[in-house]
UniProtKB/Swiss-Prot annotation:
Source taxonomy: Bacteria, Pseudomonadati, Pseudomonadota, Gammaproteobacteria, Enterobacterales
Family matches, as InterPro entries: DNA_mismatch_repair_MutS (IPR005748), DNA_mismatch_repair_MutS-lik_N (IPR007695), DNA_mismatch_repair_MutS/MSH (IPR017261), DNA_mismatch_repair_MutS_C (IPR000432), DNA_mismatch_repair_MutS_clamp (IPR007861), DNA_mismatch_repair_MutS_core (IPR007696), DNA_mismatch_repair_MutS_N (IPR016151), DNA_mismatch_repair_MutS_sf (IPR036187)
Residues at which ATP binds: G614, P615, N616, M617, G618, G619, K620, S621
Organism: Klebsiella pneumoniae (strain 342)
Matching Pfam families: MutS_I (PF01624), MutS_II (PF05188), MutS_III (PF05192), MutS_IV (PF05190), MutS_V (PF00488)
Gene Ontology annotations for the cellular component aspect, listed alphabetically: cytosol
Gene Ontology biological process: mismatch repair
Entry protein name: DNA mismatch repair protein MutS
Length: 853
């Protein structure tokens, strides 16, 4: 690529380009040239590959041809969306000078930088997902992590204590762009993530961070936000805010506060748990058959995003949860009236962000007006709901009568996409604008009359008055009649089948039309900008209203789901434990064609671990997952799929369910399983809900059994967590006899010949057998293989009839049967001293040992 070193050798235009490019060396530069954005040199080559557009040349500069690629300015959003989705950032360089008054290249400057984490344009965002920018910082005491959703102004920080917690946060928030310090030590934590941006160390400096944040919020200190004593989080937040200011190049009035997220405020779920429970993403990476796919019937995009945040951060404050439950109960008879009105509110949250950034388009203001028009009806529908939480939401919504009337007066009903197209401001809003428009419209009427007059006067039926951007207004006469044109008609352009002329009268009106249109458009832009100044003082109240509307949408949605799907309202208890009557899996019951078999569950301090046995495909994993999902739903304040639920305090949910090789990190299935198990054993508490499925697979039988036994023993005796422990090791069914607080349950099945019927019902006690061969037959394993397996099974059982009931002593961890007695031959050999034997004695010993064996 050509560089700034040999600047004088370039043309003036390329000198200007290279200076701007030097300020943004690592990102693509969209350089405005008339109706196109153009890219040069390496940017052009990269863009042609990323966007699949033609790579051409634009003349030469400094004696070298200039590689060039271009895109039309009116289609820029589509191309930006493609680049942002690929993790690219783009600097947008606009012409800010007037070509008519400029000598040499028109003045240009970068007006904004579009990055994956700072986009607010509607066309670039997925409407039902948060789009987060994040920053990560690390020192010897732990991590600092900050996230910002620029499309809502939601600014959060946290201080994860260890690597596992940090990994879980990255998975929960899934940022579109991640800023990290150039000396970041835990590179394996972030490698492979999209939108990584390396930043200099000084951007994470704590004093600069405090100064930046106080300046943004207009405060003297950060005590009021509860983040004063979170230095690592503040380092990350400071870098993040600086980056946003650098890229947006405008004030950020919608970012008004920062909130500390503390571990003790929410139920903690690690990365494996979020993945295994398929909350918003299934194991294949899609969104089908997830908890969100069943629960999310919200009618606004901002409500959908809020619901997903709730699902990923269940709260532990039962006062908040009971308020939500009361609201859901009160709205169950109202959702049919409320949802159609809420649907009209749309994505007010993101419209307000664009308003704050002054990038809102005319249609954003029209949508905002439409949203505000719904408030009186919503307030009326909620007025007689006798629940304090509902009335709180109603108050937060506000009315905004003046703003609504302002938008009704100022913006036409169906405005164009862009203000530069004109026709946005409504007639009657500005007298001066109406006058200029009348002049432009009057001149246009005159031109229509001129065409009729000239056609009749000259008797030329092909004569017509037209306009194009290059030649302005003209009179066109067909080639066949052009010889009849009067002498004062001055030829302006010759076409294949026609001639175009100009006359002084037409030129005079052209000037008048263009002047009046130009004046009207300039005034319209000015009035449009003034609308922002009138709306922005109310931004904080509008954001509060948008948040209340999103929450109302979520709660109305949960009321509808509870009613439609037959969910019950769970009750919270101070005592540890979970009691579920007729619990169901919220997703599986929707997918199944046949009725779902509901099952009970009881966990309490005296029954804190269930050893779950039963056949493969019998429903063990479903039973375990449904328990976790019912707990999760209860702790977002939702109703749950069961007949009755009572649930005690829960601080964490862990799942060790299913596994696959992590080939990218060089870890086998067994290694993945053991890593997840270690995390559980280190971090679970007596208030944790732990799901352990088939621990010990992937290694030898006795190794696996030993590990499973020791893990179960540790969870039951030492940690005392609420545990569901599914296993195929029947030896573990003896645990209830050796430890208090452990019970056996099994999933029932009936076997008839070579077939098996899964009953999917949970019964007390251990399963009688595994039904492995019946499941294999059901899976389509050839009959001769099944037949041979039955023979082998009988052989093994005859050799070791007690193998399945091996006595396992929990105190000694002797997982094999009691040691066998030493044979006489071995005893004789142990007492033998070979160095003292003569050759004859040695030979006699061989015969003697032979007889002992």
């Amino acid at each position: 690529m050509s560089t700034i070193d040999n600047l004088d050798a370039h043309t003036p235009m390329m000198q200007q380009y290279l200076k701007l490019k030097a300020q943004h060396p690592d990102i693509l530069l969209f350089y405005r040239m008339g109706d196109f954005y153009e890219l040069f040199y390496d940017d052009a080559k990269r863009a042609s590959q990323l966007l699949d557009i033609s790579l051409t040349k634009r003349g030469a500069s400094a004696g070298e041809p200039i590689p060039m690629a271009g895109i039309p300015h009116h289609a820029v959003e589509n191309y930006l969306a493609k680049l942002v989705n690929q993790g690219e950032s783009v600097a947008i360089c606009e012409q800010i000078g007037d070509p008519a008054t400029t000598k040499g290249p028109v003045e240009r400057k970068v007006v904004r930088i579009v990055t994956p984490g700072t986009i607010s344009d509607e066309a670039l965002l997925q409407e039902r997902q948060d789009n987060l920018l994040a920053a990560i910082w690390q020192d010897s005491k732990g991590f600092g992590y900050a996230t910002l959703d620029i499309s809502s102004g939601r600014f959060r920080l946290s201080e994860p204590a260890d690597r596992e917690t940090m990994a879980a946060e990255l998975q929960r928030t899934n940022p579109a762009e991640l800023l990290y310090a150039e000396d970041f030590a835990e590179s394996s934590l972030i490698e492979g993530r999209r939108g990584l941006r390396r930043r200099p160390l000084w951007e994470f400096e704590i004093d600069t961070a405090r100064q930046q944040l106080n300046l943004q919020f207009g405060t003297r200190d950060l005590v009021g936000f509860g983040v004063e004593n979170a230095p690592r989080g503040l380092c990350a937040a400071g870098c993040l805010l600086q980056y946003v200011k650098d890229t947006q190049r405008t004030s950020l009035p919608h970012i008004r506060s920062i909130t500390m997220e503390r571990q003790q405020d929410s139920i903690i779920m690690d990365a494996a748990t979020r993945r295994n429970l398929e909350i918003t993403q299934n194991l294949a990476g899609g969104t089908d058959n997830t908890l969100a796919s069943v629960l999310d019937c919200t009618v606004t995009p901002m409500g959908s995003r809020m619901l997903k945040r709730w699902l990923h951060m269940p709260v532990r404050d039962t006062a908040v949860l009971v308020e939500r439950q009361q609201t859901i109960g009160a709205l169950q008879e109202r959702y049919t009236e409320l949802q159609p009105v809420l649907r009209q509110v749309g994505d007010l949250e993101r419209i307000l962000a664009r308003l704050a950034l002054r990038t809102a388009r005319p249609r954003d203001l029209a949508r905002m007006r439409h949203a505000l028009q719904q408030l009186p009806l919503l307030r009326e529908l909620l007025a007689d709901v006798d629940r304090q939480p509902v009335q709180k939401l109603r108050e937060k919504m506000g009315e905004f009568t003046e703003l609504r009337e302002l938008l009704e007066r100022s913006v036409i009903d169906a405005p164009p996409v862009l203000v530069r197209d004109g026709g946005v401001i409504a007639p009657g809003y500005s007298e001066e604008l109406d006058e200029w428009r009348a002049l432009a419209d009057g001149a246009t009427d005159y031109l229509d009359k001129l065409e009729i007059r000239e056609r009749e006067r000259l008797g030329l039926d092909t004569l017509k008055v037209g306009y194009n951007a290059v030649h302005g207004y003209y009179i066109q006469i067909s080639r066949g009649q052009s010889h009849l044109a009067p002498i004062h008609y001055v030829r302006r352009q010759t076409l294949k089948n026609a001639e175009r002329y100009i006359i002084p009268e037409l030129k005079e009106y052209e000037d008048k039309v263009l002047t009046s249109k130009g004046k009207a458009l300039a005034l319209e832009k000015q009035l449009y900008d003034e609308l922002f100044d009138l709306l922005l003082p109310h931004l904080a109240d509008l954001q509060t209203s948008a948040s209340a509307l999103a929450e109302l949408d979520v709660l109305v949605n949960l009321a509808e789901r509870a009613e439609t799907l037959n969910y019950c309202c769970p009750t919270f208890s101070d005592k540890p434990g979970i009691r579920i009557s007729e619990g169901r899996h919220p997703v599986v019951e929707q997918v199944l064609k046949e009725p779902f078999i509901a099952n009970p569950l009881q966990l309490a301090p005296q029954r804190r671990m269930l050893i779950i046995t039963g056949p493969n495909m019998g429903g063990k994993s479903t039973y375990m997952r449904q328990t976790a999902l019912i707990a999760l739903l209860a702790y977002i304040g939702s109703y749950v799929p069961a007949q009755k639920v009572e649930i005690g305090p829960i601080d964490r949910i862990f799942t060790r369910v299913g596994a696959a090789d992590d080939l990218a990190s060089g870890r086998s299935t067994f290694m993945v399983e053991m890593t997840e198990t270690a995390n559980i054993l280190h971090n679970a508490t007596e208030h944790s809900l732990v799901l352990m499925d088939e621990i010990g697979r992937g290694t030898s039988t006795y190794d696996g059994l030993s590990l499973a036994w020791a893990c179960a023993e540790n969870l039951a005796n030492k940690i005392k967590a609420l545990t569901l422990f599914a296993t195929h090791y029947f030896e573990l069914t003896q645990l209830p006899e050796k430890m208090e607080g452990v019970a056996n349950v099994h999933l029932d099945a009936l076997e008839h010949g070579d077939t098996i019927a899964f009953m999917h019902s949970v019964q007390d006690g251990a399963a009688s057998k595994s039904y492995g061969l019946a499941v294999a037959a059901l899976a389509g394993v050839p009959k001769e293989v099944i037949k041979r397996a039955r023979q082998k099974l009988r052989e093994l059982e005859s050799i070791s009839p007690n193998a399945a009931a091996t006595q396992v002593d929990g105190t000694q961890m002797s997982l094999l049967a009691a040691p066998e007695e030493t044979s006489p031959a071995v005893e004789a050999l142990e007492n033998l001293d070979p160095d003292s034997l003569t050759p004859r004695q040695a030979l006699e010993w061989i015969y003697r040992l032979k007889s002992l064996v």
